[in-house]
Amino acid sequence: MNQSMGKFFSAAIGATVGAVLLGLASCTSIPPSKPVSWSKPEVLVAPSSFSGVHGLAIDQKGRLLAGSVVGYELWEVNRTTGSARVMIPAPEGQADDIAVGSKEELAWTNYLMGMVRYRENDSAPMKVLAKDLPGLNSLDFDRRNGKLYASQVFLGDAIWELDVSGAKPPRLVAKDVGGFNGFEVGPDGMLYGPLWFKGQVVKIDPSNGAVTVINSQFQTPAAANLDGKGNLWVIDTKTGELSKVELANGRKTVMKQLKTAIDNLAIAPDGTIYVSNMADNGIDAYNPATGEVRNLTSGKLAVPAGLRYADGSLYVADIFAFRKVDANSGAVTDLARMQASDMEYPFGVGISKSRITLTSWFTGTLQVIDRATMKTDTMVHGFKAPMDSIPMDDGSVLVIEIATGNLLRVSGAGFKEQKVVAAGLAGPVQMTMGSDGAVYVTEAAGKLTRVNLTDGSKTAIAEGLLLPEGVAQTPWGSFIVAETAAKRLVEIDANGSKRTIAENLPIGLPAGPGMPPPFVATGVAVDPKGVIYFSADRNNAIYRITPQR
């Protein structure tokens, strides 16, 4: 063999060995090692104002006011720049709808508290005009005489006249009308608004509750306002349409196609129509003279809660939407939006190769979705405040209920068969499947607990945590937990030792009166490289933290 041939064979052998080693490396993936430290959190999806935006009103000073139910706050929005600030903080500021009187009076509905609050002006004290009326939703003043009317929707179905002096109890105007949402009192003293469950807009006489149908061509009408020109402007949350209905003949004309999940509207003195969108934390300004729409403010997410990672994407239970986020670019894709789909306010999400599960403690539901078609396979009601779920390979689904402290396995036709896997969990919030086949559950009482799925036995991994919520396992076996009462993420090893990953985080949205302490669970996910993602319920962002080695 000559020298040149030797060099040739040496090079060939080297290339072959290199290829073999490369192949072995790709076939035998070595999990990343535990990092020395972590990067600072970086924004993957940008923050936004509100926590879902609902009621709108223009007050006597020309201010655009916007209400948030989940955020328990009433906001002021700059009509030129779109910048927003909290005007009445939580919890008193919770507002599903806002009404402005003929002077400076302001009233708003505390939907989840079943109350109506009122103040005569900015410097006057707040007082409660009504309470113990679940689902107080919409309200408005009769500007001729100062009378105030309010409606119950979803958690009740009635219309009331409220005494602004607080001396008299509420007077029942009508009940079981069909969900009298976002209404307005006309100059004639009649109540004009939509019947959510009947697809109608109607006129109601507050003296006797008599209902007159104006138009029946809507799918899910959410709110209506008069323009003073003989028209009733109506939004349909299911279709996203902004329509004009002529009071004289009931003729409906679709004026603008907006996004679905629109919730309320307000008409300014200059004729501009402002429309809120709960799924986007958005407010649009529509000019009826030109047909132009200007987005005043919006966000990519509404109220991000439960979070799961799969195949390069994050799946987000966004309460008013279900969304997918590209884990690299942060691009957001809508998978479902409230009212335009069969989804019911998702707070938790689970994922497997073939299925996605959504849970809502608010509606007591488990929704099972075919991942290939993104169509609902089964919707199961009747759970006792389900916080999280995991679809299993055998077809069953694991569900945790915060109201019972149970970890359930549901299976069979319609997932009607329930088996208690473990009981006595002290406020189970979120869970993750461990690499050892056990389930790891955060408990609001301050624990990270391992549950053996075979016998239901529980082992405390860590105690003394400050309202732990989201949890995910790293490739090297530890667990990342969101300690929301401390506003930090911690890494917990199997022996219970922990270290802080990041602190002073915008997490831990406080629960209002009567709500479960976790309220909106901070979601945590970890990808195969050990990158951490978490949802921030205080500013509606998603952050990414990268391991430093």
Q: What do these predicted regions represent?
A:
Residues 45-73, 536-541:
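Beta-strand-rich domains and repeat architectures in extracellular enzymes and scaffolds
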Residues 47-63, 91-110, 132-146, 151, ...:
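Beta-rich, blade/repeat-based domains predominating
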